[in-house]
């Protein structure tokens, strides 16, 4: 099994894949920057067990991170967990994607992965969208090169700002699709507004 991980600003996401690329399971954990390497190891092993997998089944690991405080701890946890190849997606990795930006090293590993995945699925030119704490739009030209992008507040970031700066708007769960475009109560109105406004931005 190949284990793929991404440490984002809000979550650590996981995917377990067969060698031919079939997704077996996916999961996510809250990205707590206070976690030690042993705590990360404990959470990863328990997450694997939840899906009936064991560390010895893992033949390779690939990960990316935009949280520098957690990156070395995750690397250490993975080395303790399995004696397999561990690949970190970051500056210097030869992905085959030409990055025509002022500073290619600033491109997040998760965004590079998204571009590689998009080029496997469609013929450029295309726009690659990544929804996370920030929503990122990346423009890929007809040659498959990254030529620019835009960053805007992500759905959760927008929701948090509204809840924090208003007296009566509630925190709502954004994972599910809104039940209707026009909400009939405050929570549904907020849910619909955040999700559909994010789509309109694109």
Enumerate the language-model features and the residues they cover.
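Short, catalytically relevant binding-site loops at active-site mouths
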Residues: 94, 133-136, 144, 153-157
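Gly/Thr-rich phosphate-binding beta-strand-loop-beta motif of the actin/hexokinase/Hsp70
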Residues: 1-24, 118, 125-142, 146, ...
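N-terminal glycine/serine-rich phosphate-binding loop of ATP-dependent small-molecule kinases
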Residues: 1-89, 93
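Fold-independent oxyanion-binding glycine-rich loops
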Residues: 7, 65-66, 90-91, 110, ...
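Glycine-rich phosphate-binding loop plus the immediately following alpha-helix
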Residues: 32-36, 107-109, 114-123, 147-194
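Glycine/small-residue-rich loop that forms an oxyanion/phosphate-binding "nest" at active or ligand-binding sites
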Residues: 81-117
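Acidic-glycine-rich active-site phosphate/pyrophosphate-binding loop
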Residues: 84-96, 133, 169-180
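Conserved small/polar residues in nucleotide/adenosyl-binding loops
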Residues: 200-202
């Amino acid at each position: 099994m190949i284990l793929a991980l991404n440490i984002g600003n809000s979550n650590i996401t996981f995917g377990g894949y067969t060698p031919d690329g079939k997704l077996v399971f996916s999961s996510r954990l809250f990205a707590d920057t206070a976690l030690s390497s042993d705590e990360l190891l404990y959470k990863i092993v328990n997450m694997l067990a939840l899906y009936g997998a064991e560390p010895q089944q893992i033949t390779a690991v690939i990960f990316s991170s935009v949280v520098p405080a957690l990156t070395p701890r995750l690397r250490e946890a993975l080395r303790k967990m399995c004696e397999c190849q561990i690949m970190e997606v970051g500056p210097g990795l030869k992905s085959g994607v030409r990055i025509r930006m002022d500073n290619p090293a600033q491109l997040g590993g998760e965004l590079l992965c998204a571009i590689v995945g998009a080029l496997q699925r469609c013929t450029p030119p295309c726009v690659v969208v990544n929804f996370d704490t920030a929503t990122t739009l990346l423009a890929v030209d007809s040659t498959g090169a990254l030529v620019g992008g835009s960053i805007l507040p992500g759905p959760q970031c927008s929701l948090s700002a509204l809840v924090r700066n208003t007296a009566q708007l509630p925190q709502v769960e954004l994972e599910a699709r809104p039940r209707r475009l026009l909400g009939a109560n405050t929570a549904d109105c907020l849910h619909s507004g955040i999700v559909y406004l994010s789509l309109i931005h694109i």
